[in-house]
UniProtKB/Swiss-Prot annotation:
Origin superkingdom: Bacteria
GO process annotations (BP): proteolysis involved in protein catabolic process
Pfam families, alphabetized: Proteasome
Species name: Alcanivorax borkumensis (strain ATCC 700651 / DSM 11573 / NCIMB 13689 / SK2)
Matches recorded under NCBIfam families: ATP_dep_HslV, PRK05456.1
Organismal lineage: Bacteria, Pseudomonadati, Pseudomonadota, Gammaproteobacteria, Oceanospirillales
Binding of Na(+), residues: 163, 166, 169
Reaction equation(s) it catalyzes: ATP-dependent cleavage of peptide bonds with broad specificity
Gene3D superfamilies named in the record: Glutamine Phosphoribosylpyrophosphate, subunit 1, domain 1
Enzyme class: hydrolase
Oligomeric and partner information: A double ring-shaped homohexamer of HslV is capped on each side by a ring-shaped HslU homohexamer. The assembly of the HslU/HslV complex is dependent on binding of ATP.
Residues annotated as signal peptide: none
Disulfide bond annotation, renumbered to this chain: none
Protein name listed in UniProt: ATP-dependent protease subunit HslV
Its biological purpose: Protease subunit of a proteasome-like degradation complex believed to be a general protein degrading machinery.
Length: 180
């Protein structure tokens, strides 16, 4: 699936802590339309955190659908993600939505794609999506492997590095965090 322009979302787990952070830039073509968008949210009574890369309106639609699945499945993250992915793949209206979601609860971190994929990251719950994702993933991997920094600091540093390199990512960061 294409990496969407206009954002960087990073999620890291360390110890009993999980953090998702994102930048605030919204771009339309080669123009910055907004610099303080909030692309990271708390869902399901604050027990799930999520971030999106892709079209803003599409992402809000997906957040609503995902939260409905969380309610339907009593907050079971994996089950809700699989059901959303199924709907996203089969529903004609949803199929046109262009976004990726990074979601996490106290136990799991997942990427949900419009292709119907639900992907659990291989290492340290590290997720990096969006145009600056590869830069942020590289930075976060190095920090996880070589420092004892807390998850929030790793996410912040990875977003900063991505923002220094990716023209579609800025330095206006928002974070959501869950402690185990």
């Amino acid at each position: 699936m294409e990496q969407y322009r206009g954002t960087t979302i990073v999620s890291v787990r360390r110890g009993n802590n999980v953090v998702i952070g994102g930048d605030g830039q919204v771009s339309l073509g080669n123009t910055v339309m907004k610099g303080n968008a909030r692309k990271v949210r708390r869902l399901f009574h604050g027990k799930v955190i999520a971030g999106f890369a892709g079209g803003t309106a599409d992402a809000f639609t997906l957040f609503e659908r995902f939260e409905a699945q969380l309610e339907k499945h009593q907050g079971h993250l994996v089950r809700a993600a699989v059901e959303l992915a199924k709907d996203w793949r089969t529903d004609r209206a949803l199929r046109r939505l262009e976004a990726l979601l990074a979601v996490a609860d106290k136990e799991s971190s997942l990427i949900i794609t419009g292709n119907g994929d639900v992907i659990e990251p291989e290492k340290d719950g590290l997720i990096a999506i969006g145009s600056g994702g590869p830069f942020a993933q590289s930075a976060a991997t190095a920090l996880l492997d070589n420092t004892d920094l807390p998850a929030r600091d790793i996410v912040a540093k990875a977003l900063t590095i991505a923002g220094d390199i990716c023209i579609y990512t800025n330095h206006n960061h928002t974070f959501e965090e869950l402690d185990g």
